[in-house]
Amino acid sequence: MQHFGLRVPLNQAGYYETGHHKELMKDVRGAINEGGLIAVCGVVGSGKTVLLRRLQEILDEERKITVSKSLSVEKRSIKLATLIAALFYDLSTEKQVRIPSGEKRERELRDLVRKNKKPVVLFVDEAHDLNRHTLVELKRLMELVEGGGGRLAVVLAGHPKLRNDLRRPTMEEIGYRTEVFSLDGIAGSQREYIRWLLGACAGDKKEAETILTVEAIDMLASMLRTPLQIQMHLNLALEASYQSGERPVSVEVVESVLSRQIDDLEPTLTRHGYSVKDLVEQFDSKAGEIKALFNNTLDATRTAALREKMLRAGLPI
């Protein structure tokens, strides 16, 4: 990267904010103040984790709301006990945190939140992997805290699958009580993001056109949608251009590194949080059928039936 005058890796450029980010941040903060379940949904690489990390930093600095975070990485196996433990660890003032069992656990947590004398927000990342029972229990936990004179908000961050799951008829108890926000990331601002990214990593007023041609920037901006996609393909283009001794990076180099399958059905659904296993379970199908659908080898009648079900469920077909 030094060949192009970049001093910082592209994935460490910092926080990029659009008007959409500002509005979303304002709306989520308002929802946190009111308490309850909040879902922030965006595709893989749209910047959910970065945005929520920034939100947590702001809340910590203001000291008006106590921030708690679940650090467990095994989301599919998470139960309510894991999330309650996170609250105990972040709210307790004891050096050696002891989490009681049975009903005493909930009673002590309710007292902890009340004694905290500030609203509490629990952040849960990768929440699309949480099962229905855990979500229902979270709702009941918030009601328990509220009944004890405290206020607890839970921010669930996940892929669009989370939003679609919350809208399913079987999730009515949770979905109707959840405020859902969609993170569109840098949609509509890809060119501005590329210019900002190169400037932030160069550490000076270097013009983006000294690194990439205008045509190369335009192609990246028109073909890619998320910060993660842009960072990855920009890295590939810079490496290819360095190897060929070309500077600035041309549109031909960018075209040579762009993934041809980036908008195929399988990667699109994966970015929205759907694995083959998820699709099999939700649409009463078989793994072989789903793979055949991805490969365009499934018979027309079954393809039409599956696509109709997926469209009704909110999948981007």
Language-model features, listed with the residues they occupy:
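A short, basic N-terminal segment
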Residues: 1-35, 316-317
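Conserved NTP-binding/hydrolysis module of P-loop NTPases
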Residues: 4-8, 70, 74-97
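Walker A/P-loop nucleotide-binding motif
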Residues: 34-54
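Conserved Walker B catalytic segment
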Residues: 37, 107-156, 164, 168-169
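Short regulatory helix/loop adjacent to the ATP-binding pocket of P-loop NTPases
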Residues: 56, 162-177
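Conserved AAA+ ATPase "SRH/arginine-finger" region at the nucleotide-binding site
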Residues: 72-74, 178-190
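Conserved C-terminal "switch" segment of AAA+ ATPases
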Residues: 93-101, 186-215
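C-terminal alpha-helical "lid" subdomain
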Residues: 199, 203, 207-317
